Amino acid sequence: MDDALQNTCAENAFVFTTDDLLKNLPFSSSKCSPFKLHHYAQLKLLSNGVIDKRVAATDELRKFNFKIDLERRYISNVLDYEFVVLDHDLSTVHVVDAETRRKLGHLNVSLHQTDPEALVISATLAT
């Protein structure tokens, strides 16, 4: 019976290691290309709840039920979520429920067309 419970949990859980967590991911210019160090820093801040002023994604982030303080540009319930990056691909940041490890969706990250310092983020919810 215990095995059945473990398998059920494993089927619903998004599989990743602590090395895949954005907050633990080291930057590598060759692996994270075309993203630069400052883009990586903006995403790393996001994983800690801070929304950089060059990231226009407040409405998109709300799709995940993030509680956002617009004045401070801070996600107050960020500890309820994990941000996962697989294979150093910063263009897709998976959003996972920290408690259940269930994938809630992902953030599509791209470079801004006219501002090389900024990121464009859109959210895709899991089905």
Swiss-Prot record:
- Pfam families annotated for this entry? DUF424
Superkingdom classification of source: Viruses
Q: What is the recorded name of this protein?
A: Uncharacterized 14.4 kDa protein
